[in-house]
């Protein structure tokens, strides 16, 4: 799998959302993945923005439409529209601020309340380059991820550590779910989903196929 540059040429379009407390680095994760850019002066996101990037998974081109919003309470009114149609999510906390991990449970509940049970969720511990300031152990989060059946990875948007891996893993897992559902339905996965259609991962009875905890910490 790898990067694919022609943005108008793709087989699948997946909506992925970033969620978590304000200031954990969601916007910089997005800009690092989509533009290979990092801003030291990144202010809290106002409202909602999204960016896109296409990658190759197997022999298919997967286009990600990645949405980013501020984690501040005053923006919670946009929740329903923000999550609608999402088939993947990166739930981000800051490894140097324990309160951001404490709030993960609330963000996870909100995410699950507004998305399908098959939505691929990656728990992301950002700012892993600041290991000397670490406030949350990798093991603590790994245990939580196993309990909640989510994926888990630690990243550094600043140093571009695991950012590519985190997004690519989420997109690959979504693709696997969609392909499996098409095959289970007796369809050819290459023709079951028209090009350009926003993908919905569907029913709630197939959760075990997706939610296998994994940890790729730095």
UniProtKB/Swiss-Prot annotation:
Q: Which UniProt keywords apply?
A: Cell membrane, GTP-binding, Lipoprotein, Membrane, Nucleotide-binding, Prenylation, Protein transport, Transport
- Which is a GO BP term held by this UniProt record? protein transport
Tree of life domain: Eukaryota
The question of whether Cell membrane is a record keyword is answered with yes
Q: Where does GTP bind?
A: 20-27, 68-72, 126-129, 156-157
* Membrane protein topology class: Lipid-anchor
Q: Which InterPro entries match?
A: P-loop_NTPase, Rab_GTPases_membrane_traffic, Small_GTP-bd, Small_GTPase
Q: What is its main location?
A: membrane
Cellular compartments per GO CC = plasma membrane
Q: Which GO terms describe its molecular function?
A: GTP binding; GTPase activity
Compartment(s) where it occurs, according to its Swiss-Prot or TrEMBL record: Cell membrane
Lipid (S-geranylgeranyl cysteine) attached at which positions?
A: 215-216
Query: Short name of one Pfam family for this protein?
Result: Ras
Question: Motif Effector region: residue span?
Answer: 42-50
Family annotation (NCBIfam families): small_GTP (TIGR00231)
According to its UniProt entry, what is the function of this protein?
A: Intracellular vesicle trafficking and protein transport.
- Protein family per UniProt: Belongs to the small GTPase superfamily. Rab family.
In Swiss-Prot or TrEMBL terms, this protein is called Ras-related protein RABA1h
Q: Which organism is it from?
A: Arabidopsis thaliana (Mouse-ear cress)
């Amino acid at each position: 799998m790898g990067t694919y540059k022609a943005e108008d040429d793709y087989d699948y379009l997946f909506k992925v959302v970033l969620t978590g407390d304000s200031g954990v680095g969601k916007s910089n994760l997005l800009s690092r993945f989509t533009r290979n850019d990092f801003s030291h002066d990144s202010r809290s996101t106002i409202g909602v923005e999204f960016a896109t990037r296409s990658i190759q998974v197997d022999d298919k081109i997967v286009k990600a439409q990645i949405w980013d919003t501020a984690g501040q309470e005053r923006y919670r009114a946009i929740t329903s529209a923000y999550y609608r149609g999402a088939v993947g999510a990166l739930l981000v906390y800051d490894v140097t601020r324990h309160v951001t991990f404490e709030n993960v449970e609330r963000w996870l509940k909100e995410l699950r309340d507004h998305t399908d049970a098959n939505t691929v969720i990656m728990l992301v511990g950002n700012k892993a380059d600041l290991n000397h300031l670490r406030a949350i152990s990798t093991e603590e989060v790994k245990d939580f991820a196993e309990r909640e059946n989510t994926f888990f990875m630690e990243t550094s948007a600043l140093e571009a550590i695991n950012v590519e891996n985190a997004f690519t893993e989420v997109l690959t897992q979504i693709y696997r779910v969609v392909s499996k559902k098409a095959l289970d339905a007796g369809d050819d996965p290459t023709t079951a989903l028209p090009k350009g259609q926003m993908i919905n991962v569907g029913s709630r009875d197939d959760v075990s196929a997706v939610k296998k905890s994994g940890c790729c910490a730095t």
